[in-house]
């Protein structure tokens, strides 16, 4: 039986009276690639951001590597991680690749990837440098580009640096929030190829995506979110080959044109 890496149970998120997530659950075992698809506004990115507490969920529980995250209410009634050290640990185990790269503009490519291993993991500069060089090479960023600042890179290169930065933490699960949606069409393929390579190597990944080809051919499991709820989920061949929900049928018909 595969080792469970991430278990999200009955997650809710409310903004005042407006409920964005209405009880979403997800289980990722080692090597799983879970794609979350759905229309804009369905709650996909909010769900991902709640998993590592970039957004505070309103209800629910999260288990990472068998460890239940201890949650308490903040003054606004939302859930937060009770212990700052546990939050820090959580974010080393679940690392995020963002839609808009979120690289530090005042740091070189190499410094961007070294920063968190030094500040969060406590690696020496030499150890962090070796790790950064290794993962930058893995995503196809050569030594010449490593000394550049993000502004001098293409969008595809910046996103590959962002993936290297996430990998440098050597996390349990990689979270991808629409990693290709800010890219020019001709740059999408280079990022998807890296993600496919990571999947083939057995990395555990949760991916919010509009790339139906990736969801269909690389995922082990697909979740279709609609208005904050799971409308349908299952193996990709089931969801794409024989969708049961009329909403999913309509969504796929529009997406696969």
UniProtKB/Swiss-Prot annotation:
Its EC number is 7.4.2.1. It holds the Pfam family ABC_tran. The keyword Isomerase does not apply. ATP binds at residues 40-41, 43-46. GO terms for biological process: amino acid import across plasma membrane; L-histidine import across plasma membrane; L-histidine transmembrane transport. Keywords: Amino-acid transport, ATP-binding, Cell inner membrane, Cell membrane, Membrane, Nucleotide-binding, Translocase, Transport. InterPro entries: AAA+_ATPase, ABC_ATPase_HisP-typ, ABC_transporter-like_ATP-bd, ABC_transporter-like_CS, MetN_ABC_transporter-like, P-loop_NTPase. Its main location: membrane. It is a peripheral membrane protein. Residues 6-252 form the ABC transporter domain. The keyword Translocase applies. It catalyses: a polar amino acid(out) + ATP + H2O = a polar amino acid(in) + ADP + phosphate + H(+); L-histidine(out) + ATP + H2O = L-histidine(in) + ADP + phosphate + H(+); L-lysine(out) + ATP + H2O = L-lysine(in) + ADP + phosphate + H(+); L-arginine(out) + ATP + H2O = L-arginine(in) + ADP + phosphate + H(+). One of its GO terms (cellular component) is membrane. NCBIfam families: PRK10619.1. Part of the ABC transporter complex HisPMQJ involved in histidine transport. Is also part of the ABC transporter complex HisPMQ-ArgT involved in lysine/arginine/ornithine transport. Shows ATPase activity. Responsible for energy coupling to the transport system. This is Histidine/lysine/arginine/ornithine transport ATP-binding protein HisP. It comes from Escherichia coli (strain K12).
